[in-house]
Amino acid sequence: MFLSTLFLVSLATCVICGNPSSPPVVDTAHGKVLGKHVNVEGFSQPVAVFLGIPFAKPPLGSLRFAPPQPAEPWSSVKNATTYPPMCSQDAARGQAVNDLITNRKEKIHLEFSEDCLYLNIYTPADFSKNSRLPVMVWIHGGGLKLGGASSFDGRALSAYENVVVVAIQYRLSIWGFFSTGDEHSRGNWGHLDQVAALHWVQDNIANFGGDPGSVTIFGESAGGYSVSILILSPLSKNLFHRAISESGVAFIPGMFTKDVRPITEQIAVTAGCKTTTSAVIVHCMRQKTEEELLEIMHKLNLYKLSLQGDTKNSDQFVTSVLDGVVLPKDPKEILAEKNFNTVPYIVGINKQECGWLLPTMTGFLPADVKLDKKKAIALLEQFASMTGIPEDIIPVAVEKYTKGSDDPDQIREGVLDAMGDVAFGVPSVIVSRGHRDTGAPTYMYEYQYYPSFSSPQRPKNVVGDHADDVYSVFGAPILREGASEEEINLSKMVMKFWANFARNGNPNGKGLPHWPKYDQKEGYLHIGGTTQQAQRLKEEEVTFWTQSLAKKQPQPYHNEL
């Protein structure tokens, strides 16, 4: 132990910033960290990588269901060259999702732990404190219950675009969002972890070559949703300066609730805890082991949909809540009042958000299930019970999305398109309009491309599935084998758009197709094999759902949608 510590200290004393022959060692507010250099094909200069840097204390014991606390300082040099454990989750699903979406060439075996508040950093090897490079902070997706930072290798984005990439982790599921709706467990712990990571970036990223005054937060699915929540939250004011939401915004149905009682009591009862008071529940839940909480998740099956059973009693997410801290009001009210972080904002979706990945991973529509109209209505009724959509709208929606056809393939495609619009397309347009109306620069895109390394089980007609854009954003065609020149060039273009936006709040630049602002003309960019301007993304679908819902309730748009 003494010799290994001596070795790390000797590295710290001999390292010279900008000398890639020496492993990089950087000072943080809590102690020194040792990283490593990794190569990117086509670049002579490597990327400096730091893995598993703690940004908060392990959220264990009394810190379970509590705000994150600053990390404890360390005296020796901390080895930051191995992937940190991902936050507690279903291990089999977590590994499966990682293997499907990772941009890495090699596969890694993941570890999972309640001790998981770590971040990874990728920065050009010649960095110095004076580099002042744009910082891009990635928030992973996974429905607030799966995923982690290490599925995403930031080396290509960092090398090609000369930016600092930071991938953060946050508590998930019960650990991240359990709430009693009062001071005993307010909830939104995962969002508070995200805020804590952004504070860490402000305090430390300059030493890694980053500019704390030029921070872009970006994320996909639940990560894009989290970005949107952070835009609306007063806690994150001045912690970032631009934002990108990919396939996820604050209005995703079923991801936010004002009433935590049903799911909280269900969790407590399943855990064998008395529900007499909030204090009793929280005390009992803190005594449970990590394995016991995982077993509760499995018993409750918290978000799997199926065609079987009573469609009116589908299971719930453990979601973001109205806590009075992260979210002082309903997100819809905050957006309407225009009182939030009005930073430049990119919002995007994929062409077929529910094409294959989400139905497969959640089990709500296996590939071998044939649908008729009756089954389609039953499935969408179950989906509606999760999202707050009145059931009597469903038959009309089925007719619209299937174009009146009785063909099972067209019914299936229509049902999945309806789900994609309700969950992603329509909310993304509504949030973009609200952001635009503050005067903040706003951009929208729709991505449509079939990645060459998609799962062999994925149908060839699903082009632009959930998370497909992430492959381009993180340079997967460059890091993985088998991509065509067209696919590699698409990824380079997308990385350039994202990095330009991180640099100056505008994705446009020399040699790129023009990306119009999302103004009253509602211009957006169609990104894919052919990248070109278009107008009024999902206009017909937004009109259908908003008008249908307006007839059923006094509010212009449902609280959850």
Curated annotation (Swiss-Prot):
Tissue: Expressed in liver, white and brown adipose tissue, kidney, intestine, adrenal, heart and ovary. Not detected in muscle, lung, testis, brain and spleen.
Reaction(s) this enzyme catalyzes, per UniProt: a carboxylic ester + H2O = an alcohol + a carboxylate + H(+); all-trans-retinyl hexadecanoate + H2O = all-trans-retinol + hexadecanoate + H(+)
First-listed, main subcellular location of the protein, grouped into a coarse class: other
Location of this chain's protein in the cell: Lipid droplet; Cytoplasm, Cytosol; Endoplasmic reticulum; Microsome
Disulfide bridges in this chain: 87-116, 273-284
Single GO term (MF): all-trans-retinyl-palmitate hydrolase, all-trans-retinol forming activity
Entry keyword set: Cytoplasm, Disulfide bond, Endoplasmic reticulum, Hydrolase, Lipid droplet, Microsome, Signal
Enzyme Commission code(s) on record: 3.1.1.1
SUPFAM superfamilies per UniProt: alpha/beta-Hydrolases
PROSITE patterns: CARBOXYLESTERASE_B_1 (PS00122), CARBOXYLESTERASE_B_2 (PS00941)
Keyword Endoplasmic reticulum: yes
GO biological process: one example: short-chain fatty acid catabolic process
Active site per UniProt: 221 (acyl-ester intermediate), 353 (charge relay system), 466 (charge relay system)
Short sequence motif Prevents secretion from ER: positions: 558-561
InterPro entries named in the record: AB_hydrolase_fold, CarbesteraseB, Carboxylesterase_B_AS, Carboxylesterase_B_CS, Type-B_Carboxylest/Lipase
Source organism, top-level taxon: Eukaryota
Gene Ontology CC: one annotated term: endoplasmic reticulum
Conditions for induction: Induced by fasting and repressed by refeeding.
Signal peptide: 1-17
Similarity comment: family membership: Belongs to the type-B carboxylesterase/lipase family.
Function noted in UniProt: Involved in the detoxification of xenobiotics and in the activation of ester and amide prodrugs. Hydrolyzes retinyl esters. Hydrolyzes p-nitrophenyl butyrate (PNPB), triacylglycerol and monoacylglycerol. Shows higher activity against PNPB, a short-chain fatty acid ester, than against triolein, a long-chain fatty acid ester. Shows no detectable activity against diacylglycerol, cholesterol ester or phospholipids. May play a role in adipocyte lipolysis.
PANTHER family: CARBOXYLESTERASE
Official protein name in the record: Carboxylesterase 1F
Gene: Ces1f
